[in-house]
Regions:
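Weak global preference for isoleucine
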Residues: 4, 11, 40, 68, ...
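Extended, hydrophobic/aromatic-rich amphipathic alpha-helical segments that build helical scaffolds
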Residues: 36-70, 85-94
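Long, intrinsically disordered, low-complexity segments
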Residues: 32, 36-37, 72, 77-147
């Protein structure tokens, strides 16, 4: 398989959609404070649809190829005649690069965490999820039992 050696493929990152300094809202000048929080993009919905279809789901809305090609058309890429799940994941990586750690969570969800180790850094399963704050565990002790 591929050897992952770059930050965008292996770590949580959110660096897209920053505005040029002449378009900043006065008073909102800290790193990241001037960008609106994007919950989800239509391209991501299309890519999730394509992933579900390549994993065996059915749909009357559109095919996996149609979903991928809708994303590719917007960015000026040539259409594909067929797609595999691996191609869908690569398309998702390209389309959503640097957005919200999507690749990181995909790799954890798909059990491909070996791809998250690179440059002498080793991913371990305890890094899959953020810890539950101790104040919440103190309020509801059963939360601490899932370690």
């Amino acid at each position: 398989g591929d050897k992952i050696t770059d930050y965008a493929r292996a770590m949580f990152a959110s660096g897209k959609h920053y505005l040029p300094s002449d378009q900043l809202t006065p008073g909102r000048t800290d790193y990241g404070t001037n960008k609106n929080f994007t919950c989800i993009r239509y391209a991501e919905v299309l890519l999730m649809h394509a992933e579900a279809l390549t994993n065996g789901a059915t749909s009357s809305a559109m095919t996996a190829v149609a979903a991928i090609n809708a994303v590719r058309e917007r960015s000026g890429m040539p259409a594909l005649s067929s797609v595999t799940n691996e191609q869908v994941m690569e398309e998702k990586y390209a389309e959503l690069a640097m957005e919200w750690g999507t690749r990181f969570y995909d790799m954890v969800r798909l059990g491909k965490t070996s791809e998250l180790s690179y440059d002498g850094r080793t991913f371990s399963a305890d890094n899959s999820f953020l810890p539950i704050p101790q104040t919440q565990v103190d309020l509801l002790p059963v939360l601490g039992s899932s370690k």
